[in-house]
Amino acid sequence: MHPNVYIPDAFLEKIQTILPANLNMEDFISACQRPLRKSIRVNTLKMSVEDFVKRAEDKGWTLSPVPWCDNGFWIEADESVVPLGNTAEHMSGLFYIQEASSMMPVSALFMNDESYDAVLDTAAAPGSKTTQIAALMKNEGVLVANEYAASRVKVLHANIERCGVRNAALSNFDGRVFGGWLPEQFDAVLLDAPCSGEGTVRKDEDAMKNWTQASVLEIADTQKDLIESAFHALKPGGVLVYSTCTLSTEENQQVCHHLKETFGDAVEFESLDGLFENANAALTEEGFLHIFPQVYDCEGFFVARIRKHHSVEAPQVKKRMGKFPFVKASKKESEEISKQLHNALDIELPSESTVWLRDKDVWLFPDALEPMIGELRFSRMGIKIAEAHKNGYRWQHQVATALATGAESNAIELTIEEAREWYMGRDVRPQIIPEGLKTGKGEVLVKYQGAIIGLGKWVSNRIKNGLPRELVRDKNLF
C-alpha cells in the first residue's frame, strides 16, 4: 500500500469536476493509494510471445494479458533474490519492464496493423515506447527517437541497444523544432508529451508534491507548441498519437482541440473505441481515451489518435548544418564487409540498409534515413558494426544484439554459471564446445538459453569477454 501518497486538496477538487458521472471519488483515491501492478512487454524483435510465455512458466512467473497490447503482461514474480531487471531474459532484451498504460499510445498508433516507413517519437527516453514501435516496425524503415534532455539520451541508447533495435536514429532537440526542420517527413508521429504527471502517483508517492494549477497551464502551453510541430512534421494522410500520463483536461482534450482550432478540417480525431475490448469505459465524446486509475487498475493516462487530411503551411526555418562526417561505402567495400562478417560470424547484413564509413568506423544505416541526412543533426544513427584495422574488421557489440539471431553456426551456448561470469565482465572457458566449432582464435557469439548475450574472442580455450564496460553487472544476477 501507498497510504502516504500526497494528493493536494486543490487537485482533488479539480478531479471532482472532471470525473465521469459513472465514477466516484472514493474509488479514485483508493486506486491512487494502491501500488501499481508490475507489467512487462515481450520484445518480439528477440522472441515470440508464445516462446516467452513458455519461458515464464518454467521460471514460475505468472502472466496476465494486458488487453490493449498483444505482447504486454502483468507479471507476478518472486524478486526477493533476483530483481526482474537482473534476470537473463531482461538483460538479453527479451522483455522490457513497462507500465501497462504506457503501452497504449503505441498500440493506438498501430491500431489497424499499419506499416510505416518513417516514424517520429518526439519525446523518447527512456525508450519503452521507442522499442515498442521498433518491434511493430519489425526493425524496418526508420524510427527517429528524439529526446530533449541530454542526460536521458544515454539511457535511451542503452535500451535501444539491449532490445536489438537497428532502425533508429537518435536526436537531442526541443520537440518544437521538427515541424520547421522536417516538415511532412513522417508517416506517423508519437507525441508522448511532457506533462504534470498527475497519473503517476501510484508509482511515485511524491509525484504531486509540486503540483499547482498554474504549473498545469504552463505545461499545457508547451504541449500546444509541441503538438503543432508534430502535426507539421506529419505527412498528409499520416497519423499522430498524442498521449500524457496526466488527467487534467487542459493538458489533454484542450490541447487536441487547440490543434483542431488551428488547422481546421486538416485534423480528424479518430475514435479509439475499437482499440481493445471495454475501451469504451474510458472513451470521451471525441473518441479519446481518458483513463482514470480505477477503470483498468493502471496509471492515469490519456491517448488521442489524430489523422492529418491535407497539407498545412509549415513555418520557414533557417538551420545551419555542419559537414556530415560519414561517407557511403562503395559497392566493393560493402561487399567485402558483408563477406567478412559472414565468414567470421555467419551473420548477413539486412536488406534495406546501407554501410557508411567514418574514418575507421563502420556503420549500418537504414535506407529510409537517407532523405533526412543533411536536414537534421543526429546524435546517433543506425548501429556501429565494426572498426577497421590492418587485419580486417573488429566486430562490435551491436552486431550481436541487433543482427545475430542465435541460429548462427559460430555461436556457443553458455551454462548458467558461465553466463553469470560473462555479465560480470569476466572471460569464460566453456565446458561444452559443439562439434565443428572453430576455437583457438577469431571472434565468437555467445548465448544463454538460446538468446545471444554478446560477442567474444577466442584466446586458446577461453573466450575473451567483449561486453562493453557500461553493461557489466556485479551482483544479484539470475
Swiss-Prot record:
Record flagged with keyword DNA-binding: no
Single GO MF descriptor: RNA binding
GO BP annotations listed: rRNA base methylation
Main location: cytoplasm
Pfam family, one: Methyltranf_PUA
Keyword annotations: Cytoplasm, Methyltransferase, RNA-binding, rRNA processing, S-adenosyl-L-methionine, Transferase
EC number(s) reported in the record: 2.1.1.178
Residues where S-adenosyl-L-methionine binds: A123, A124, A125, P126, G127, S128, K129, E147, D174, D192
GO cellular component, one term: cytoplasm
Compartment(s): Cytoplasm
Active-site feature positions: C245
Catalytic activity: cytidine(1407) in 16S rRNA + S-adenosyl-L-methionine = 5-methylcytidine(1407) in 16S rRNA + S-adenosyl-L-homocysteine + H(+)
CDD domains per UniProt: AdoMet_MTases
Uppermost EC category: transferase
Record-stated family: Belongs to the class I-like SAM-binding methyltransferase superfamily. RsmB/NOP family.
PANTHER family (UniProt xref): 28S RRNA (CYTOSINE(4447)-C(5))-METHYLTRANSFERASE-RELATED, NOP2 YEAST -RELATED NOL1/NOP2/FMU SUN DOMAIN-CONTAINING
Protein role: Specifically methylates the cytosine at position 1407 (m5C1407) of 16S rRNA.
Protein name: Ribosomal RNA small subunit methyltransferase F
Species the sequence originates in: Vibrio parahaemolyticus serotype O3:K6 (strain RIMD 2210633)
